[in-house]
Amino acid sequence: SSSLVGSEMCIRDRLKPVHRRIIYSMYQLKLFKSSSYKKCARIVGDVMGKFHPHGDQAIYDSLVRMAQDFSTRITLVDGQGNFGNIDGDNPAAMRYTEARLQDYTNYFFDGIEENSVDFKDNYDGQNLEPVVLPSQLPNILINGAMGIAVGMATNIPPHNILELIDALKLIIKKDKASLTEILKIINGPDLPTGGEIILDSNEKKQIYKNGKGSFNINAK
């Protein structure tokens, strides 16, 4: 259903449709880290006109969140201007703020020009958009995921990118690496705001084994 597709993130690139469309539009505009910033109003207009005709404010809110280092473990968007803060102050209007892609986001486009992923028609059949972005990194574990849809929900915490890469190296090198071996590398979730996670080793193992559980966080 459209509710399910719009609410749950795709496991392959950890993006909801609105996030994917923002990033792909910025890719088409060549807003890479090495380029100059562009007004968010222009980016939002491009996304809404080509791919996501669901209101400019919803698009802008999603763009802002991808640029907030207190909301996202590794930001996908490099924002310039007032993008809000952790105390709850709102970002400036899109006509004042500017954005471009982060270097990290380059890993989402490997081979996209060589048909490494499928494309589909946009809402009016005038443009093509990727079904999923060819991310080289496990972004769903790096930045976590949260979504609620009809009959299901997910809440995956973010993790440290260096620990995940080391764990992937172990899995590639040793096909049947045990969970115990993997958890010697991955210490647990790594949240954007820092803090101390209260979780003993047995609880941690059960959470990663079963995919369910909870933990407490002490602020620094």
Regions found by a protein language model. Give the residues of each.
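Active-site cavity-forming subdomains of large catalytic enzyme subunits
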Residues: 82-123
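Short, conserved phosphate-binding/catalytic loop or strand-edge motifs used
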Residues: 19-21, 38-46, 77-85, 146
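Extended, well-ordered alpha-helical scaffold/bundle regions in very large, multi-domain proteins
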Residues: 32-70
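Single conserved hydrophobic/aromatic residue that forms the stacking wall/gate
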Residues: 1-6, 11
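Intrinsically disordered, low-complexity regulatory segments
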Residues: 49, 53, 118-143, 148-220
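Non-catalytic interaction/clamp surfaces of large macromolecular machines
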Residues: 50, 60-64, 70-95
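N-terminal cofactor/phosphate-binding cores enriched in small/glycine residues
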Residues: 14-40
